[in-house]
Amino acid sequence: MSLFLGIDTSNYTTSTALYDSKTGEMVQQKKLLPVKEGQLGLRQSDAVFHHTAQLHTLIEELLKDVDTSKIAAIAASSRPRPVDGSYMPCFTAKILSSAMKIPLYTFSHQEGHISAALFGSQRTDLFDKQFIAFHVSGGTTEAVFAKGFGTGFSVELAAHTLDLNAGQAIDRTGLMLGLKFPCGPQLEQLALKNTEKIKVKPTLKGCDCCLSGVENLSKKLIDEGKSPEYVSAFCLKYIEQTLSEMTKRLLEKYGELPLLFAGGVMSNQIIKNSFEEKYNAIFAPPQFSADNSAGIAYLGYRKYNNVHTRV
């Protein structure tokens, strides 16, 4: 048996993935949650309902031409972070595991992002090393000091936002510009058309950041009649400079460790290009950077392989 099924549910996306450990191929099926125009997200109860409905369709599509007897294990995200008191429902994964009589391994959504970024960037060597990992999305903006132990990661919070998450700042700015949620890709396209110079001054407290100013300043620029292209570029520049200053301070604190960036915001090419140039940072391809279950599926493979190697 060489196949590993991964399931992940986040604030914005329902994701499934199938990893073939013989060929190294990763196949994904994912779908955004249905958010009404002008809204910033869903209530938790509504999100759970839609995740459950979408998972059935996605899994059926993912496995339609697959010999399911070759699935060795299922892996699912059961909590946002690898810390106590953190929880996400994974009912579908439990039902499938029981029905198929195969192991179920659970990991955190954050571990999944880190794993996907390492897999996608072909840096799986870091599963056994120390590094600094940023997880920057609509639900999280933080950096952790990560220690890989082969089948997962122990993490120590190193820095985080004190108010808005980066993805929230992007979406709120985008909605003020009349864009459709989630606004990241549209905001990036507008920003790329800007030709004016932009200066920003990020706000940090130690290694932690404050991003609520992005929303307020973007609104001020809109009220002043600045173009959507300029406002979009300003928003992304502010976030890029904030993350850059956080990175600089963390390297001063922890030393010259490898830098990994994951999460939907880090699939933005403007930010990505800047960080690759400044810090030689590790990024995953876009399909492994935004919310996905590929990292969860790969963690399931590593866990299964570790357990059965020791037997």
Question: Which positions does each model-derived feature cover?
Answer:
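A short helix-loop
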Residues: S2, G6-Y12, A17-Y19, V27-Q28, ...
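A contiguous, well-structured pocket-lining segment that forms one wall/lid of small-molecule binding clefts
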Residues: Q189-L259, V265-E276, N280-F283, Y301-R310
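Glycine-rich phosphate-binding/hydrolytic loop that grips phosphoryl groups
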Residues: H113-A117, A284-V311
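Short Gly/Thr/Asp-enriched flexible loops that form oxyanion-binding sites at enzyme active sites
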Residues: A76-K101, Q269-E277
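Conserved phosphate-binding catalytic cores of ATP/NTP-utilizing and phosphoryl-transfer enzymes
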Residues: M1-S2, T106-I132, Y298-R302
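Active-site nucleophile and cofactor-binding loops and adjacent substrate-binding regions
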Residues: M88, L104-G112, H135-V136, T161-L164, ...
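Glycine-rich beta-strand-to-loop/alpha-helix junction loops that act as flexible
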Residues: A76-R79, S137, L260-N268
